[in-house]
């Protein structure tokens, strides 16, 4: 039986290795090769013991073959040891990438957090520089970088999340201002209701005018008495009403449009609009009719006119649904005013004159809202929505325009002197349009 050596291509140290996919295929084939070599080694050992029992095999040539076979067996064992060490090293290398990958992810996440904190710190520093009003920034805006810290914990250190933040201050100021405005409007509505109750409680009979009340007797718009020097009759009719429906309509309009106008124009300008609307409406009634009238709804129409101007100039900053709701209420109030004018001493010229006065006066005093930063320069008559916002018109400008309007009315009254002019009546104007 002849002997022959088995040669296998086994990767040794220093040789080129396969990739991961090729390595799996190589390892599966290597098992079969290893089993074949083990079978060959067993067969060689049996053959070696058999050869010792045969005298012929003790010749030098046969001994050389046995030495060669034993040397090849040693080489095979060495290669198997190299394979074992290689597979052990390969297994360790497979576990290391997951650890290194996790470390890389942690480093990237930490770098991203640090970059976000840097950008946030720069933004807060810019806000701090732009803030000019006192008490706008509650605390020093500094972001401390530390390992394992989160953005939320660092923001808590800046003082933004506490109750003294700039946005919280703005909300508190707006709420306090709205409360003050509502109180002012409620006081005016209470005065109207109180005067109406006093009218019902103090009836007076006059020979020329019939049954009147004490407030109507001394405060209604009567042209002859105005020309005689009782100029206050251009002011007092704005607080007089012809009955419960009239005062209810006036109070409802005042409580609906009053807070809006008061918030947009300011409390001082709101009061000037209210007074100017009443005076202008009574003056318009003085020019067009000689009948005694009251004008309690005149100031309400002046507020509607000022509100319309504000909605037109700031339409991009106002919600459409709120505008539509109030516009419908304005139409309803106008319709009820026209109906009530046929059931009492209410002159439609009073409402029309007050509406025109509110529109004209509001056009010159209405603040224009625009978005901008706190560091920008504030222009005259423009409200900046931001850290330096101003929720009212310029009081000096409003008072100056109010003085001009009153001066024009007084001058016109002095120039007329002989009583109302020969203007067409309100019904004539309506019928001519139809």
UniProtKB/Swiss-Prot annotation:
Pfam families: Rhomboid. InterPro entries: Peptidase_S54_rhomboid_dom, Rhomboid-like_sf, Rhomboid_protease_S54. Disulfide bonds: none annotated. Coiled coil: none annotated. The chain crosses the membrane at residues 182-202, 209-229, 238-258, 267-287, 289-309, 326-346, 352-372, 399-419. GO terms for molecular function: serine-type endopeptidase activity. Probable rhomboid-type serine protease that catalyzes intramembrane proteolysis. This is RHOMBOID-like protein 9, chloroplastic. The lineage of its organism: Eukaryota, Viridiplantae, Streptophyta, Embryophyta, Tracheophyta. The gene is RBL9.
